[in-house]
């Protein structure tokens, strides 16, 4: 049997990100992907994100971009190796992350007003 890795994805695209930079090292690649500020609360280091339909783990995050680290296996079984700097990619935020973040925000706002 084949193991299915990654997180559950729905195919709902939240935004289109742009590849700001690609760092190549040996047989791996780091993609640095820009994102709109309104999604900053949902893009967390070691969290999950969908990039062009592929479930990936988020690396470092800064105010305007996040990193994903692509290992040889990922590069060989996806089309992510064909991406270039400046390429647009479809981004799906992990639904569990969105739900947890929104729940915490709602609880905190209720506590502040109550």
Please name every model-derived segment.
Residues 1-114:
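Conserved loop->alpha-helix
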